[in-house]
Design a protein with these regions (language model features):
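Generic hydrophobic alpha-helical segments
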Residues: 2, 6-9, 60-61, 108-112, ...
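Surface "functional belts" at beta-alpha junctions
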Residues: 50-146, 171, 176
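N-terminal beta-alpha supersecondary unit
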Residues: 1-27, 102, 143
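Stable alpha-helical structural segments in soluble proteins, enriched in small hydrophobic residues
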Residues: 9-13, 46, 64, 149-160
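DPxDG-like acidic metal-binding loop motif
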Residues: 22-51, 56
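Residues at secondary-structure transition points
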Residues: 1-4, 30, 34, 38, ...
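Acyltransferase
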Residues: 140-190
Length: 190
């Protein structure tokens, strides 16, 4: 599980030795985001270690800082929707072209047509690539396709440090349970 892995990575170091802890706070699976953020909050709180909240999509884009390109970070949000953000990678920096969003495959296709070449990466890259059907898309190689610790660290470099109490998950849409509850309330009103 997560805590034994953290202990193994830390080796002889203690949590109190850290200057900050970076975490991808979303978007992503509701459970995965909650577990990651809660774990970091728990680790950081006791020793008052600053936290850095990083977009999962930005962490993915940071895998390409050695190239000048457009990166389309995508995560499967189900029902042919994707969590997505676009980044221009230039001179070793990722410049955000749009905010993190939940987007349909058709809307994403329209957005991507204006670029000459786009590298598509993330856990939704293969599904997205297979359904876009446009020529300017390149599927990222497996070794750069997914988020990794290095990408999180690079994305966190110039971000604001916050307290563990201020660290919160970032969700781009309601969970299925929240959507169903909202629908039930709406049905009761009618």
């Amino acid at each position: 599980t997560l805590l034994p892995m953290i202990k193994r990575v830390m080796g002889d170091y203690k949590i109190s030795d850290l200057d900050a802890i970076a975490v991808t706070a979303g978007p992503g699976s509701f459970t995965g985001v909650r577990i990651g953020v809660a774990t970091v909050k728990g680790l950081a709180f006791n020793d008052n270690i600053p936290c850095v909240s990083v977009s999962t999509l930005e962490a993915i884009a940071c895998n390409f800082l050695d190239e000048d390109c457009i990166v389309c970070s995508v995560m499967d949000a189900r029902r042919m929707q994707f969590y997505n953000a676009l980044f221009e990678i230039k001179n070793g920096k990722a410049v955000r072209l749009c905010e993190d969003r939940a987007i349909s495959i058709d809307d994403l296709k329209n957005d991507l047509k204006k670029y000459e070449k786009v590298i598509i990466a993330g856990d939704g890259a293969r599904l997205c690539y297979d359904n876009l059907g446009i020529d300017n898309i390149i599927l990222a190689p497996e070794d750069k396709r997914y988020q990794c610790g290095q990408g999180v660290a690079l994305a966190a470099e110039n971000k604001e440090k916050i307290s563990a109490a201020a660290l919160m998950p970032v969700y781009l849409r309601l969970s299925q349970a929240e959507r169903e509850l909202k629908l039930q309330k709406k049905d009761k009103e009618n």
